Amino acid sequence: NGERAPGSKKAPSGFLGTR
């Protein structure tokens, strides 16, 4: 989760990419 999510742009991969 969070590899290419909208949250992963700022946070590292898998940090808060679920949002």
UniProtKB/Swiss-Prot annotation:
<keyword id="KW-0027">Amidation</keyword>
<keyword id="KW-0527">Neuropeptide</keyword>
<dbReference type="GO" id="GO:0007218">
    <property type="term" value="P:neuropeptide signaling pathway"/>
</dbReference>
<comment type="function">
    <text>Myoactive peptide. Increases the amplitude and frequency of spontaneous contractions and tonus of hindgut muscle.</text>
</comment>
<protein>
    <recommendedName>
        <fullName>Tachykinin-related peptide 3</fullName>
    </recommendedName>
</protein>
<keyword id="KW-0964">Secreted</keyword>
<dbReference type="GO" id="GO:0005576">
    <property type="term" value="C:extracellular region"/>
</dbReference>
<feature type="modified residue" description="Arginine amide">
    <location>
        <position position="19"/>
    </location>
</feature>
